[in-house]
Each structure stands twice: as C-alpha cells, then as structure tokens.
Amino acid sequence: MNRTERFRRVALLMASFLRNLAYLRAFKDVHARIPMDWTRDFWITQGGNCTDIAVLEWCKLFADRADKHHWSRIVADLDAFKPSLLARLGMEEAAYSDYVTSVRRYRDKFVAHLDSDNVMDIPMLDIAERAVFFYHQHLTTQEVSDPLQVFRPLPSSSAELTLYFEHHCRAAAHTYNEVLPPLRTI
C-alpha cells in the first residue's frame, strides 16, 4: 500500500469514527424516548454499537502503535506531532496516556473480548473527537500535498470535516425524531 492509499484509509477511519460519534450523540439526546416495548433492545443495541465502532476506529488511529494507521506510522515529523496534539487537547502527557489506556481498556475488556471485569467504564469521547479533528487537520495541511484529490469524496479540509460531522448529527437526530414516539409527560 502506498502512502497516498494509507492517507485515504486513515481518512476513512476518521470519517467512520465521526459518523458513529454523531449517531451516538443523537441517540443520547433521544434516549429517554425509547419505548418500553419490543423495540427497546434494538435501540439500546444500536447506541452501543455506535460507541463500540467509534472506539475501535479511534484505537486504530491513536491507541495501537503497531497498527498501520496509527499516527506514528503516518506522520512525517513524529517529534512535532505529539506535542502539538497534546497542546491542542490541553493535556499533559500523563493525562493523555491515561485517557488512551482507558479507551484501549474498554475496547479490550468489553468490545474485543468479554473479560471478567464487573464494571464497564465507557470512555467519554470528547477528547477522542478533538484528537481526530487535529489529526485530520495535520494530514490536510502538513502531510498531503493535494487533499482534495486524496480524500474525495471524504472531507478534505477542517471546514469540510466539521460540516460532515454536523451533517451526520442532524441526519441521525432527524431519523430518531421520525421513528421514535415523542416523550410523554405525566
């Protein structure tokens, strides 16, 4: 696989992460409206699947150094990327490392395998989201000479990535609002 193909595959993982995060956030907004009937398991499973796929995709990009899509195997200037990432996230190295460990642990203990842990700590994905936006911006401004050619039809700029994410948030919210009954008040 050549470098251009690797950039494109990284962009595909980023898009998948953000789509699933958008669907998850829209799901959380309507969670209270899920009916207590035979469809409930479907909705709960759908929300959980979005979480799991988002975590899996993010781990490929940030948690597994051996993965061919991990930032350390893609970016040219390794010494500059991580400090810039940490600065963008507003985190120290230790806090970021703890966060990566928590996301990886959720993936390893509950998504990839069902280990014997009794408590499932589902990671918050706000930091993961900001990391993906940073990585995408880095690729489109520092690594890829022609992002439009490499990424199309995927977002090829930070502005396009933001629109892509917002579009999927709105699309999911619209879909949920169309199919779920309104919240009943007593």
Region annotations inferred by a language model:
Residues 1-99, 122-186:
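Amphipathic alpha-helical interface segments
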Residues 93-120:
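Histidine-centered, metal-coordinating catalytic motifs and their short helical/loop contexts
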